[in-house]
Protein backbone atom coordinates (compact mmCIF):
# COMPACT_ATOMS: atom_id res chain seq x y z
CA UNK A 1 0.00 0.00 0.00
CA UNK A 2 1.27 3.47 -0.83
CA UNK A 3 2.08 5.72 2.07
CA UNK A 4 -0.78 8.00 2.99
CA UNK A 5 1.20 11.00 4.15
CA UNK A 6 1.48 14.71 3.47
CA UNK A 7 3.84 17.52 4.42
CA UNK A 8 2.78 21.10 3.84
CA UNK A 9 4.40 24.45 4.52
CA UNK A 10 2.31 27.62 4.36
CA UNK A 11 3.63 31.13 4.77
CA UNK A 12 1.58 34.30 4.49
CA UNK A 13 1.94 37.80 5.91
CA UNK A 14 -0.24 36.57 8.82
CA UNK A 15 0.99 33.05 9.62
CA UNK A 16 3.82 30.56 9.16
CA UNK A 17 2.90 26.87 9.33
CA UNK A 18 4.80 23.62 8.88
CA UNK A 19 2.71 20.45 9.10
CA UNK A 20 3.20 16.73 8.52
CA UNK A 21 0.53 14.02 8.61
CA UNK A 22 0.58 10.22 8.47
CA UNK A 23 -2.93 8.73 8.22
CA UNK A 24 -1.59 5.27 9.13
CA UNK A 25 0.22 6.35 12.26
CA UNK A 26 0.08 5.47 15.93
CA UNK A 27 -1.31 8.69 17.39
CA UNK A 28 1.96 10.59 17.79
CA UNK A 29 1.40 14.32 18.23
CA UNK A 30 3.83 17.22 18.29
CA UNK A 31 1.86 20.47 18.39
CA UNK A 32 3.41 23.89 18.77
CA UNK A 33 0.98 26.69 17.91
CA UNK A 34 1.61 28.86 20.94
CA UNK A 35 -2.03 28.38 22.03
CA UNK A 36 -2.11 25.69 24.71
CA UNK A 37 -5.79 24.79 24.44
CA UNK A 38 -5.56 24.56 20.64
CA UNK A 39 -2.49 22.30 20.93
CA UNK A 40 -4.44 20.15 23.40
CA UNK A 41 -7.42 19.77 21.04
CA UNK A 42 -5.20 19.03 18.03
CA UNK A 43 -3.42 16.39 20.12
CA UNK A 44 -6.81 14.74 20.77
CA UNK A 45 -7.29 14.51 17.01
CA UNK A 46 -3.94 12.74 16.58
CA UNK A 47 -4.17 10.47 19.63
CA UNK A 48 -7.74 9.24 19.19
CA UNK A 49 -7.58 9.09 15.39
CA UNK A 50 -4.25 7.23 15.43
CA UNK A 51 -2.80 9.83 13.08
CA UNK A 52 0.77 11.08 13.41
CA UNK A 53 0.52 14.87 13.23
CA UNK A 54 3.29 17.43 13.67
CA UNK A 55 2.37 21.10 13.56
CA UNK A 56 4.62 24.10 14.09
CA UNK A 57 2.74 27.36 13.63
CA UNK A 58 2.75 31.00 14.62
CA UNK A 59 0.63 33.93 13.60
CA UNK A 60 -0.19 37.57 14.15
CA UNK A 61 -3.44 36.74 15.98
CA UNK A 62 -5.37 33.71 17.20
CA UNK A 63 -8.09 33.89 14.51
CA UNK A 64 -5.60 33.85 11.63
CA UNK A 65 -3.59 31.10 13.34
CA UNK A 66 -6.56 28.77 13.91
CA UNK A 67 -7.97 29.40 10.44
CA UNK A 68 -4.66 28.77 8.66
CA UNK A 69 -3.90 25.63 10.69
CA UNK A 70 -7.37 24.34 9.69
CA UNK A 71 -6.67 25.19 6.03
CA UNK A 72 -3.31 23.44 6.11
CA UNK A 73 -4.54 20.39 8.02
CA UNK A 74 -7.50 20.03 5.64
CA UNK A 75 -5.20 20.20 2.62
CA UNK A 76 -2.91 17.61 4.22
CA UNK A 77 -5.80 15.19 4.80
CA UNK A 78 -7.00 15.68 1.22
CA UNK A 79 -3.49 15.11 -0.15
CA UNK A 80 -2.82 12.04 2.03
CA UNK A 81 -6.13 10.46 0.97
CA UNK A 82 -5.16 10.76 -2.69
CA UNK A 83 -7.84 9.20 -4.92
CA UNK A 84 -9.56 7.84 -1.78
CA UNK A 85 -9.63 4.33 -3.21
CA UNK A 86 -10.44 1.55 -0.77
CA UNK A 87 -11.42 3.80 2.14
CA UNK A 88 -14.44 3.11 4.33
CA UNK A 89 -15.50 6.68 3.46
CA UNK A 90 -18.43 7.30 5.86
CA UNK A 91 -18.31 7.02 9.64
CA UNK A 92 -19.64 8.46 12.85
CA UNK A 93 -18.71 8.54 16.51
CA UNK A 94 -20.36 9.66 19.72
CA UNK A 95 -17.98 10.37 22.58
CA UNK A 96 -18.63 11.22 26.24
CA UNK A 97 -16.36 13.24 28.48
CA UNK A 98 -17.66 13.37 32.03
CA UNK A 99 -20.76 15.61 31.84
CA UNK A 100 -20.58 16.17 28.08
CA UNK A 101 -21.56 14.18 24.99
CA UNK A 102 -20.61 15.03 21.40
CA UNK A 103 -21.39 13.38 18.08
CA UNK A 104 -19.72 13.59 14.67
CA UNK A 105 -20.80 12.03 11.37
CA UNK A 106 -18.73 12.48 8.23
CA UNK A 107 -18.38 11.46 4.61
CA UNK A 108 -15.01 11.67 2.85
CA UNK A 109 -16.87 12.30 -0.40
CA UNK A 110 -14.48 14.82 -1.89
CA UNK A 111 -17.02 17.58 -1.29
CA UNK A 112 -16.39 19.98 1.59
CA UNK A 113 -19.42 20.91 3.68
CA UNK A 114 -20.10 21.45 7.38
CA UNK A 115 -23.21 21.51 9.54
CA UNK A 116 -22.77 22.42 13.20
CA UNK A 117 -24.95 22.37 16.29
CA UNK A 118 -22.56 23.61 18.96
CA UNK A 119 -23.49 25.40 22.15
CA UNK A 120 -21.09 26.79 24.69
CA UNK A 121 -22.07 28.58 27.91
CA UNK A 122 -19.24 31.10 27.61
CA UNK A 123 -17.42 32.79 24.74
CA UNK A 124 -13.97 31.82 25.98
CA UNK A 125 -12.12 28.59 26.81
CA UNK A 126 -9.09 29.78 28.80
CA UNK A 127 -8.01 32.27 26.14
CA UNK A 128 -9.48 30.38 23.18
CA UNK A 129 -12.67 31.97 21.78
CA UNK A 130 -15.38 29.31 21.45
CA UNK A 131 -16.46 30.61 18.02
CA UNK A 132 -13.07 29.41 16.76
CA UNK A 133 -14.08 25.80 17.49
CA UNK A 134 -16.80 26.13 14.84
CA UNK A 135 -14.53 28.07 12.48
CA UNK A 136 -11.75 25.47 12.76
CA UNK A 137 -14.11 22.56 12.05
CA UNK A 138 -15.83 24.27 9.10
CA UNK A 139 -12.54 25.30 7.50
CA UNK A 140 -10.98 21.88 8.10
CA UNK A 141 -13.95 20.09 6.46
CA UNK A 142 -14.08 22.41 3.45
CA UNK A 143 -10.33 22.22 2.78
CA UNK A 144 -10.26 18.49 3.59
CA UNK A 145 -13.08 18.01 1.09
CA UNK A 146 -15.40 16.07 3.37
CA UNK A 147 -18.94 16.45 4.71
CA UNK A 148 -18.94 17.05 8.46
CA UNK A 149 -21.93 17.06 10.79
CA UNK A 150 -20.88 17.92 14.35
CA UNK A 151 -23.07 18.26 17.39
CA UNK A 152 -22.66 18.85 21.10
CA UNK A 153 -25.60 16.95 22.57
CA UNK A 154 -25.24 18.27 26.11
CA UNK A 155 -22.81 19.19 28.86
CA UNK A 156 -22.16 21.71 31.58
CA UNK A 157 -18.40 22.22 31.16
CA UNK A 158 -17.31 23.98 27.96
CA UNK A 159 -13.83 22.44 27.98
CA UNK A 160 -15.35 18.95 28.21
CA UNK A 161 -17.77 19.76 25.36
CA UNK A 162 -14.93 20.85 23.07
CA UNK A 163 -12.72 17.91 24.00
CA UNK A 164 -15.53 15.37 23.46
CA UNK A 165 -16.14 16.98 20.06
CA UNK A 166 -12.49 16.71 18.96
CA UNK A 167 -12.32 13.11 20.20
CA UNK A 168 -15.51 12.24 18.28
CA UNK A 169 -14.02 13.85 15.17
CA UNK A 170 -10.85 11.80 15.64
CA UNK A 171 -12.71 8.51 16.06
CA UNK A 172 -14.93 9.16 13.03
CA UNK A 173 -11.96 10.16 10.86
CA UNK A 174 -10.04 7.07 11.96
CA UNK A 175 -12.90 4.83 10.82
CA UNK A 176 -13.62 6.72 7.58
CA UNK A 177 -9.96 6.84 6.47
CA UNK A 178 -9.45 3.14 7.18
CA UNK A 179 -8.89 0.83 4.23
CA UNK A 180 -11.61 -1.77 3.67
CA UNK A 181 -9.83 -4.86 2.22
CA UNK A 182 -12.99 -5.81 0.32
CA UNK A 183 -12.72 -2.53 -1.56
CA UNK A 184 -8.98 -2.33 -2.11
CA UNK A 185 -8.09 -0.16 -5.10
CA UNK A 186 -11.72 0.75 -5.78
CA UNK A 187 -13.38 4.10 -5.10
CA UNK A 188 -16.27 3.74 -2.62
CA UNK A 189 -18.82 5.36 -4.93
CA UNK A 190 -21.32 4.24 -7.57
CA UNK A 191 -19.71 6.92 -9.78
CA UNK A 192 -16.48 4.94 -9.75
CA UNK A 193 -14.53 7.88 -8.34
CA UNK A 194 -14.47 10.49 -5.60
CA UNK A 195 -13.43 14.11 -6.08
CA UNK A 196 -10.02 15.02 -4.69
Swiss-Prot record:
Protein's UniProt keywords contain Lyase: yes
Keyword Electron transport: no
Compartments in which it is found: Cytoplasm
Pfam family, one: IGPD
InterPro entries for this protein: IGPD_sf (IPR038494), ImidazoleglycerolP_deHydtase (IPR000807), ImidazoleglycerP_deHydtase_CS (IPR020565), Ribosomal_Su5_D2-typ_SF (IPR020568)
Keywords linked to the UniProt accession: Amino-acid biosynthesis, Cytoplasm, Histidine biosynthesis, Lyase
Reactions this protein catalyses: D-erythro-1-(imidazol-4-yl)glycerol 3-phosphate = 3-(imidazol-4-yl)-2-oxopropyl phosphate + H2O
Source superkingdom: Bacteria
GO CC, alphabetical: cytoplasm
Pathway as given in its UniProt record: Amino-acid biosynthesis; L-histidine biosynthesis; L-histidine from 5-phospho-alpha-D-ribose 1-diphosphate: step 6/9
EC number: 4.2.1.19
A GO BP annotation: L-histidine biosynthetic process
PANTHER family: IMIDAZOLEGLYCEROL-PHOSPHATE DEHYDRATASE (PTHR23133:SF2), IMIDAZOLEGLYCEROL-PHOSPHATE DEHYDRATASE HIS7 (PTHR23133)
Entry's family note: Belongs to the imidazoleglycerol-phosphate dehydratase family.
HAMAP family listed in its UniProt record: HisB (MF_00076)
Name this polypeptide is given: Imidazoleglycerol-phosphate dehydratase
Amino acid sequence: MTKRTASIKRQTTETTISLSLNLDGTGQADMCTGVRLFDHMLSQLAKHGLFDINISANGDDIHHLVEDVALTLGKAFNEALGERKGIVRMADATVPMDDSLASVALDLSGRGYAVMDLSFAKNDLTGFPTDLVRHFLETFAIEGRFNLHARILYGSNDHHKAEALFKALARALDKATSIDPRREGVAPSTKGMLEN
